[in-house]
Amino acid sequence: MRLVLPAVSAVLALLVLTPLLGRGFVLNYDMVFAPDQSLLPDGLGLGSALPRSVPADAVMSFATALLPGDVVQKIVLLAALFAGPLGAGRLVPTNSVAIRVVAAIWYGWSAYVAERLFMGHWPYVVAYACLPWIAAAGLAVRRGEPKALPKLILACAPAVLTPTGGIIAAVLAVVCSGRRKLAVTVPVAVLLNMPWLLPSVLHPGGSLSSPDGAGAFAARVENWGSPVTSVLGLGGIWNAEVVPGSRGMPLLPVITLLSVAVALVGLRSLAPRWGLAPARSFVVLGAIGVAIAVFGTLPGGGDVLAWAVSHVPGAGLLRDSQKWAAWWALPLSLGFALGVEAAGKYLTNRTALVALAALLPLITMPDFAWAGLGRLEVVDYPADWSAVRTVLAADDGAGDVLALPMSAFRRFSWNGDRTQLDPAPRFLPRTVVIDDVVYVGGRPVSGEDGRVATIRGVMARNDDLGAFGIGWVLVEHGTPGSVDPGVLRGLREVWSGPWLTLYRVPGVIAPPPAGAPRLPVVAGDLGALAVVASGLLWLLLPAGRFSRSSHSRTAEEQACAH
């Protein structure tokens, strides 16, 4: 019976990822992996852009130094889609394996995972997978169990790859550990988040965001229900293009409300099993996640968010508010499973009830299976990309790379014309400047990198790009957008192929604009690494090992003395 839960979790992961397990890359929206990602200033939060993907890019640069990037990608996705349901099943306070399986499937086969995976938000999927393990370790810390704190540290570590994941993990860890442990858990949570927190605070351009994104990235309705019912069902992501078609099923709002009702009944049994305080905090945090997710859709909520992101540093993290529904996923999954367990006591055919409850997520969202029924595919980069990388790596000249056409996203025929983030910043061995304006429903949402706006003005005036730290211009072919010939006039063509053309900017190349100060940022990185390393050593080394060795030597010395 011990193997049932791991087996179910493995089946769930393979049902989604089997078509993607061959060699090659899955490139879709924000999910961009490269064969060998270089460690660049942006990966540490030292560039001109805000650290949105810090320390994820730095971690991937180290990982791809050990294994090919496509192998790293498959390991990350498999581990996340396996660990999430496994952790949720283990967290349920019950002796019934069947009820644990219900919770595992509800947690692993959710709209949150599907939509974030299709959006390419793999760090969010990783953070989501960590939450059950964080909750379990936090509850163990609250109970004062041995080695609970290092387990909590290691459970949080993969989640802090991005600011959002780090905050979601840190808050859950603190809530589950309880008030009496705040003196320990809060400093640990802050230290783990230092790799992105310090670059954000010390960023010379500040950390304010455009108010345009408050409404554009708000949770959205997926059927005839409301954004609230979508979020309660763990859906509602702002981008309609990544939503599984089954989320528009007419019965879904009714099923969602009934499921929430069952979950609320089941959550009543958490208090006698976990204790009133942790159970209440756990459920309240889930409710807060729902409230944040739908706040921008309420009357006046969008205006409040727009003011906050443009006046409060760091409030831009509240955009794309549906991501905070991750806090609701565990209460929903555990509560529903416990509700099914409670209902089973009054039914004679308990097996049928549990089977239906377990299969309901798969029945209502079958198009999550098999990589979204072909939505995701494995592709290879054209040879042009490796050729340009080689040219740039062999040149010692100064300067960053400007990628054209000016657009954050690309659509290449070699990737099935899928919308994908420009791979140049992760594929090439130099800092690459790309446009950070995002278009949502045809409306532009301004970016946060002041350097991009400056370079846009330089190109409009046909000024010298080298004076602004640009030493190379990369033109990507076969993707929407155009390049003004005047921008390329006077540049020297270095390499050209069917997909890419690389130009050298002549003359003296000025240094790039300064980012966050290097010393405190690196110190924060080392502090986070030290916390993780300490947690790992603490967990691996036997308790009292050195004290026992010391006592043994003392006894031997005394025996020799006599």
Region spans (language model):
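Aromatic-rich transmembrane-lumenal/periplasmic boundary elements in polytopic membrane proteins
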Residues: 9-48, 185-232, 402-422
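Periplasmic/ER-lumenal interhelical loops and adjacent helix-loop junctions
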Residues: 42-43, 191-270, 321, 457-460, ...
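Extracytoplasmic
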Residues: 6-10, 210-212, 361-562
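Membrane-embedded helix bundles of polyisoprenyl
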Residues: 9, 82-91, 98-178, 182-200, ...
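Signature aromatic-anchored transmembrane alpha helix within multi-pass, membrane-resident enzymes
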Residues: 187-190, 337-367, 525-532, 561-562
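Membrane-interface coil-to-helix junctions
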Residues: 10-85, 105, 110-128
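Membrane-helix boundary/interfacial segments in multi-pass membrane proteins
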Residues: 113-125, 245, 283, 287-338, ...
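Hydrophobic, aromatic-rich transmembrane alpha-helices
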Residues: 236-239, 250-291, 532-545
